[in-house]
Amino acid sequence: MNHANRRRFLLATGVLLAAPFAGAQPSKDKTAHVGILVMGGRAQRGHLEQALLQGLREQGYVEGKNLVLERRYLDGMMERMPDAARELAAMKLDAVVTTCTPSTRAAQQATSSMPIVMAAVADPVGQNLIASLARPGGNITGLSSQAEDIMPKMLELFASVLPKGAKVAVFVEARSNVHPRMWQALGPVAQALGLKLAKIDIKSPANVTLPAAFETAAHEKADAILVLPDEPVFLTRRALIVELAAKHRLPAFYGVREFVDEGGLMSYGENLRTAYRNAAAYVGNLARGAKPAELPVEQPTKFELVINLKTVKALGLTIPQSILIRADEVIQ
């Protein structure tokens, strides 16, 4: 989709979504029954649940009053996903919010009638989750991430703090459907920037393979780490990843700010809290009787650059003033 067409699509999406969402109130005495299916653990994702609940309050739904939220956090245990999805489908909820590709696909396989709301899922068209962004068809709608599209900009920003000819180890989730395409997209950009890339596959269990991956990166004399976005395996283990990066004194770059909040160096990507809050608008609309097939899928229009200055100093790096000025937030 070219820039002009994408702009027109986003404007149309805004009109379509704003009309039913703005100022809409729940039906009198109506209790919304909503599910959330999460690959990770609640301790690592609780702030995103709070963003969803905030958005639902803005829609007029308050937990304990006129909202029942069925939570299914799987703590990274992929094998539990199909059963959890079927369990939620059997409840005939107003909607179930899915937070990654595996949870969306599991919900899709569990039900063809109950509405499914994606919260920042990568490339739902390419993964055959929906027919198109404008008219998704079926029972899935919500928000798509654009991580694959912004990879060139992400690498360009990260390259600004690395020496020319630096070697970057790229962490790729071995089971991911989208990471292979992200990896391929990085090649030409890295060549133009004078960077060398080394792919490191992260297999299950990540708690074991992540430490080994950092050892591999160090052995291959990598100058930095790039953790590809859009995979719950990495986000759930962000504290471990940040700790290992500090241990090996490797600058590490990320696609979401949660890593930087934990002490990571730098991130560029969409704000997940905003995505979850926006997902609540879809839930509210569906609870009031809208059809998921007719609600366009929203794409992020703003991406944030976040830098942790404490980590910058600990690693002895220098961030160009031009990058600091562009940052949406600099954590002191």
Q: Where are the regions a protein language model picked out?
A:
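Short hydrophobic alpha-helices and adjacent helix-cap/hinge residues
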Residues: 1-332
